[in-house]
Each structure stands twice: as structure tokens, then as C-alpha cells.
Amino acid sequence: MRQIDLRINNMPIDPPTVVRAFLASGSLPLSRSISQVQTMLSSADYDSCDLAEHLRMDGNLAAKVMAAANSAFFSRQPCATIDDAVNRLGTLQLSRIFAQVLANAALVHPYHAYDLPAQAIWRHSIFAAVGAEMAARRKGEDRSAAYMVGLLHLIGMLVIDSLWVKKPGSPKFTLVNFAQEWSVDEIKFCGIDHPTFGAELLRQLTFPESIVKTIATQYDDPADSLSNALYVGRMSRAFRGITLKIDHCQEVIEHYDLNPESKLQSFLTDIREEAQRAMQAA
């Protein structure tokens, strides 16, 4: 993550300090149990019984875990306990559920600095998550990680928005283009963009480094399978069912075999339809 001297009202700040204060303020309504669960999931040798005990302490997370374990995809027979659910789902699915709970806490209210209503930011996130996952599936890559980076790639906007509301009279941010989005105005405001704050937030919540890195570098040229998938996710939320008017990265298009343009348009249309179904089910 690039090191930049941030200043608001001529007071220097740094991303780790801002994010620690943000989390301590309760602005992101996550229980202590949820943070402990993610810490355990990031460890390869966690104890499933201990994990189940922490899950029991958060009703929302426990309910989602039980619902997933009893879904048609996983359920060969009814799953009656949270212990059974943990063993049935495994680390990847539990991490995905955690990401959904985190996104639901962070992305369901208006972002005033960006003049975006809650429904808009949630839609952006779902479309990017579905797009990234479908891109990963196309190449047999890590679908769960792709979904996670798509779902959470805008979470740093919440941190910047919390700073913006504390500085009355600040101008609202403008979406410039696909390559930069709101980052131009974010940098004018506090010296840094939302990907850096988002990456730091996820780092402090002990997300895998691959997720953190991909969030931090989302405006750089894609350099690996996960950043390729997120690029497609971002394209998916920019697509409106007509010609996509962006100078897209040809390396990504070729990686997913999406030439000619009509093939890309067809794939983005499929993503749009799947994302709309996901929105209705959420």
C-alpha cells in the first residue's frame, strides 16, 4: 500500500490510525465475535469447536451459517447444530458468509460524500461480486475469493465518508471515469483514495493478504487472476445493457476469451441478469 501523508484541516493522519479509530467508534456495526471469527478463519489450523462457539455469540452470523448449511447445495440431511454447520461448510464458504455480513453492515446506508443512496452502493457491490465470480468460474479460478473482492472492493468509501461528514462544506465527489472513478476527488479531500482505506480496513479485520492486495490495487493494471476477476466485476457494475464506453484492458479481455466485442457484451448481459437475481434474493 502506498505511503501518502494525509492532511485534513492541515493535520497529518495515516490510514492505519484512521481505520483503527473508525472501527473503535462503532461506525461499522460488527460484534466482537465476528472479528474473532474472521481471525480464526484466517488461521489454517483453527479449532472447529472454538469457531462454532464464537459463531453462537452472534445471532445474525449464526443464522446465515445455518441457512447455508441447510441449503439445497450443501444439505443431504438436516443440519441441526452450529457445530455440524461449521464442519459441513468449510473455511471457504464460512469466509464468504463473513464477507456478506460485513458488506451488509457497511453498504446498506447512504454515502453522503458520493451522493449515493444505500441501494446504489449495495447494487454496485452485488454486481461486482457476481461479475468477478462468473469471470473466475470461466477460467476455473478461485470463485470464492473473486466474489469476496467484488463484494468488498468499495468498502473504503465508508471510511472516507465518515471523514467527509466531519468536515462541513466539503464538496461532494464526482465519478470521473472507469479508470479513476471517485479517486480524483478523494485525493483532493484527504490525500488518498478509497482502495487504500478499504485494504487497511480488511487488513485490520484479518482478511487474507491476497484480498487486501487486490482491493488496494484495483485501479492499477490487473496483474493476477484475482485482480483480473475484480476488473471484470467493476466492468459489470459499469455496464448498463448497451455498449460499454470504456477503454477496457485488452489483457483481461483476452484472458477470459471475450473477443470480439459482441462476446464481451453477451457475457456482461449474463452477469447483469444473474446479479439482478442475486439482488432479489438478498
Predicted regions and their residues:
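Conserved alpha-helical "signature site"
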Residues: 1-167, 182-247
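Terminal helices and disordered tails flanking the catalytic cores of nucleotide-processing hydrolases
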Residues: 1-19, 252-282
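Juxtamembrane helix-loop transition sites at the ends of transmembrane segments
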Residues: 79, 111, 174-175, 255
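Post-HEXXH active-site segment of zinc metalloproteases
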Residues: 165-177
